[in-house]
Swiss-Prot record:
Cited PANTHER family: PROTEIN-L-ISOASPARTATE O-METHYLTRANSFERASE (PTHR11579), PROTEIN-L-ISOASPARTATE(D-ASPARTATE) O-METHYLTRANSFERASE (PTHR11579:SF0)
Localization annotation: Cytoplasm
Keyword field: Cytoplasm, Methyltransferase, S-adenosyl-L-methionine, Transferase
Keyword Cell cycle attached: no
Lineage per the UniProt record: Bacteria, Pseudomonadati, Pseudomonadota, Betaproteobacteria, Burkholderiales
Principal place of residence: cytoplasm
Disordered as annotated region, ranges: 1-25
Source species: Bordetella parapertussis (strain 12822 / ATCC BAA-587 / NCTC 13253)
Protein name (record): Protein-L-isoaspartate O-methyltransferase
Gene name for this UniProt entry: pcm
Cross-referenced Pfam families: PCMT (PF01135)
Length: 259
């Protein structure tokens, strides 16, 4: 079912951004909340079936409108069950967000694929920033497509969790993981061809917009109670275009770092 989603109360546009509304659909429901620990490389017996389950997940993504073969292949390549607690491994390939501890979640597969496909459509970004690395899953998927991935996480416990997961999959040299304030971006590395933000603020931080390369794209959830994905493209030194996409539900975007 498709429905119109109004902009969230209190939302505002950064200078230079122009709105362009589109129809949206609800793609995420209530999020489960439970602590999570790093999963071992073999979560019970799931490893024996994970290839089959990943292929089923990819087929579902196709039916949900994901058509970029690079994204589908990347989703098929990364074992999502290794990024969640062993007790939740049997649910890893469901189209659901799952808790990873610290009141945070791993996004549902469709949302991960949708966000990556949006910033990669008709292009091949060379340098990408992920804001809100969480358990490291989305960074691992990005690393299958993008040559240079920078992922920033504000919560120390999740930073350590992501680092362990990326090391276990031998991706630590392909993803530069940073413990820091994602709202500030990484100005010393910018500009970025694409920025993927995995938490929702009332507005996109200006620091992130400024770190987009000319023609670069940023995708992020925006809003509080009512959220939707927004896709922003830098069109000039002080100008950005904006398009509203699907309605979603993400954890809040917060400033600062947490030890």
């Amino acid at each position: 079912m498709r429905k119109r989603v109004d902009p969230p109360a209190g939302g505002r546009l950064a200078p230079g951004i122009t709105p362009a509304n589109s129809n949206t659909r609800i793609s995420a429901g209530a999020l489960p909340r439970a602590p999570a620990q790093p999963a071992p490389l073999a979560s019970g017996n799931l490893g024996l079936n994970s290839d089959r389950l990943r292929q089923a997940m990819v087929q579902r993504l196709r039916t949900q409108g994901i058509v970029d073969e690079r994204v589908l292949n990347a989703m098929a390549a990364v074992p999502r069950h290794l990024f969640v607690d062993e007790a939740l491994a049997s649910r890893a390939y469901e189209d659901a967000a799952l808790p990873i501890g610290h009141s945070q979640t791993i996004s549902q597969p469709w949302v991960v694929a949708r966000m990556i496909a949006a910033v990669c459509e008709d292009r091949a970004p060379a340098r990408v920033l992920e804001v809100g690395a969480g358990c490291g899953y989305q960074a691992a998927v990005l690393a299958q497509i993008v040559r240079e991935v920078h992922a920033i996480e504000r919560i120390r416990g999740l930073y350590e969790l992501a680092r362990g997961h990326l090391r276990a999959l031998r991706l630590a040299t392909r993803v530069r993981l940073i413990h820091g304030d994602g709202m500030l971006g990484v100005p010393g590395v910018a500009p970025f061809d694409a920025i993927v933000v995995a938490a929702a603020g009332l507005a996109i931080p200006q620091a992130l917009l400024d770190q987009l390369a000319p023609g670069g794209r940023l995708i992020a959830p925006e809003g509080s109670t009512h959220q939707r994905l927004v896709l922003i493209e830098r069109t000039g030194a002080t100008a950005w275009s904006r398009k509203e996409l699907e309605a979603v539900r993400f954890v809040p975007l917060r400033a600062g770092i947490q030890s």
